[in-house]
């Protein structure tokens, strides 16, 4: 049986879990845990459904990236992470490490850049599944890479193969960049 790699856009899914579940979930010492709980529910469902041999969870470390070096206005209007979410990034990183899941949050790179790099690096060696809420990732869909787009809540996802991308948007995955530039 061929080995599989699942790459989870950690920032995308942690934000989705944070907003999908009530902020009343906390640890005994008062640290919010709603995003961690929702993220782990998604992760365990992915393990069950996709049965990967390898899993990686890249996420954004900070707002300072090579893109902000090139253009100060890059994502300048984006609000910072809510205070209740910030400590959950470290919690989820710790849980992933205990579970043996590769966690990558390199400074200077965005999580979705790492998702793309890993996908292109490994798709010739094994099937790759990307899990994200970021439609920009559709450009990575190929005969060896399926992009699972999160939909409503924390458990519904759409498997976006090249055929599914074409059926929904009437473009090839390689044209996603052009479509986004025109929007």
Annotate each language-model stretch with its function:
Residues 1-60, 66-67:
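Non-catalytic, usually N-terminal nucleic-acid engagement modules in DNA/RNA processing proteins
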Residues 2, 23-26, 76-183:
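Extended two-metal-dependent nuclease catalytic cores across DNA- and RNA-processing enzymes
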């Amino acid at each position: 049986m061929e080995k599989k790699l699942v790459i989870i856009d950690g920032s995308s899914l942690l934000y989705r879990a944070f907003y999908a579940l009530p902020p009343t979930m906390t640890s005994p010492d008062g640290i919010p845990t709603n995003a961690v709980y929702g993220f782990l529910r998604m992760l365990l469902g992915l393990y069950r459904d996709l049965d990967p041999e390898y899993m990686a969870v890249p996420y954004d470390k900070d707002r300072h990236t090579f893109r902000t070096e090139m253009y100060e206005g890059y994502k300048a209007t984006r609000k910072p992470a809510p205070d209740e979410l910030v400590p959950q990034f470290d919690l989820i990183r710790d849980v992933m490490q205990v579970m043996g899941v590769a966690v990558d949050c390199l400074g200077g790179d965005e999580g979705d850049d790492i998702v793309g790099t890993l996908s292109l690096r490994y798709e010739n060696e094994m099937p790759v599944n990307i899990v994200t809420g970021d439609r920009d990732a559709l450009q990575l869909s190929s005969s060896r890479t399926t992009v699972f787009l999160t939909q409503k809540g924390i458990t519904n996802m759409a498997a976006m193969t090249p055929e599914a991308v074409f059926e929904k948007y009437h473009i090839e995955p390689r044209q996603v960049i052009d479509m986004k530039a025109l929007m």
